[in-house]
């Protein structure tokens, strides 16, 4: 398990029982250094690390060796302002949540721009617009799910860019709240082995689980620092067996949740 230890500017590696195996990276802007690493993804034996402070995606071997850098600071094509999450398609193309540019970019494996969703630099709450997108996840059927951070919703797109659905509060229109299917800032999204969608609901201190079409299924977690409690669930991932791992922001820990049978 690879964990973005953001404020320490490093990645820590654990086995699935929580034992530390190794770490790599240090705070900085050089090759092999990290500026606030965010939501990670592994593809093709490589680790893709979006760097919030360094405005780039850095690609590492699983041994921690820096292999290449994609993107640079800016608002042009293939440039980023605080990328928060990345997903990689089977063909190697990248989808990047470009936080301050209020857009999601699709890039070829070498970083060449393909297209974008959202209007650069302009936050919005209509379908296909974004207000500080934080993460992306790609389902097996090609559906792209975007955690639309301060719009308090999730948006789903077909691989060709068509908006499929959106959910979160009434009409998914930037209304936050504590109810099932509502959010108070969404910071991470992940796909389970059965295609269900898991969402980190930051200020509600919980994780919500949805069917692929956005139908609410269940939620877990509550405010606090005890087992099963969160002080802001900030990031998550789901293992092949359905186990959910959650980064518990202010509690400075990772929690492991077994799937309900």
Description of each model-found segment:
Residues 1-261:
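Eukaryotic scaffold repeat domains enriched in small/polar residues
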């Amino acid at each position: 398990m690879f964990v973005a230890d953001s404020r320490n500017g490093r990645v820590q590696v654990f086995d699935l029982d929580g034992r530390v195996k190794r770490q790599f990276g240090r705070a900085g802007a050089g090759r092999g250094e990290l500026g606030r690493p965010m939501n990670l993804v592994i593809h093709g034996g490589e680790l893709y690390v979006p760097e919030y402070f360094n405005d780039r995606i850095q690609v590492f071997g699983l041994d921690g060796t820096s292999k290449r850098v994609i993107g640079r600071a800016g608002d042009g094509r293939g440039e980023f302002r605080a990328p928060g999450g990345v997903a990689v398609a089977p063909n190697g193309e990248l989808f990047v949540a470009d936080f301050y540019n209020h857009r999601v970019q699709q890039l070829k494996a070498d970083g060449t721009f393909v297209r974008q969703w959202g209007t650069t630099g302009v936050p919005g709450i209509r379908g296909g617009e974004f207000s500080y997108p934080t993460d992306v996840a790609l389902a097996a059927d090609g559906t792209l799910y975007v955690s639309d951070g301060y719009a308090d919703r999730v948006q789903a797109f077909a691989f060709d860019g068509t908006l499929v659905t959106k959910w979160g509060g009434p009409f998914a229109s930037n209304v936050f709240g504590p109810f099932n299917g509502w959010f108070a800032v969404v910071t991470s999204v992940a796909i389970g082995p059965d295609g269900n969608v898991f969402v980190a609901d930051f200020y509600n201190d919980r994780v919500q689980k949805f069917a692929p079409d956005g139908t609410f299924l269940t939620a877990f977690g509550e405010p606090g620092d005890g087992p099963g409690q969160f002080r802001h669930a900030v990031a998550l991932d789901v293992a092949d067996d359905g186990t959910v791992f959650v980064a518990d922001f202010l509690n400075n820990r990772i929690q492991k949740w077994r799937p309900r049978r």
